[in-house]
Amino acid sequence: PGQLSRHEKRFKLSSLDKNARMRTYEEAFFWLADARIANICYAASEPSVGLSLSMEQTALKCYMADTGLLVTLAFSDNNDTDEDVYRAVLRGDIGLNEGMLTENYVAQSLKANGHRLFFYSQSGKKEGEERMEIDFLVTRPYVNAAGKPRISPIEVKSPRRYGTISLDRFRARFNKKIGMAYVLHPKQLEWDAEAQLAHLPLYMAFCL
């Protein structure tokens, strides 16, 4: 929970050991995924069909495979019963990072639909680069390409008011490579076929 509650959700190996290297823990991450305890999301440097070809194994996010378990662990030091905690979360009576739960829920939904999890990140530290991060990349049939597969970027938003700067930059840069873009948010369905952009209620994550 501590890793996911940060704004930058990329897993930091230094939280395990200041001298940690991915080759040391690679097998441990594989075991967590294979045991269905965690859903591992890898960075892809190129948003093209065949995301595994540009996968960066040293850059990853580690989501809990069960969002309910994540909530339980996040409040494990709370004296209230699980029922009281869930009720408080639903009512908004507990101050917490909703983005942590929302993004974990979407990761769980995409994984359940058979997607391997990838994200895109550009630090913006190099000259001429713009900073951007896309929460998830999935491969889906694209109507405007005769149903052939294209990469669809997915942004996850938990507040009702939000911006889409990263998604806008990503679409402008990779316009010819990607298909329909999606924003999952706590609002109603908005479908713009001309702009190839869909805003979906969070519960519709299972449709992707």
Locations of regions flagged by a protein language model:
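A cross-kingdom feature that marks ATP-driven nucleic-acid transaction machinery
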Residues: 27-208
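Conserved helicase/translocase motor-coupling segment
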Residues: 1-34
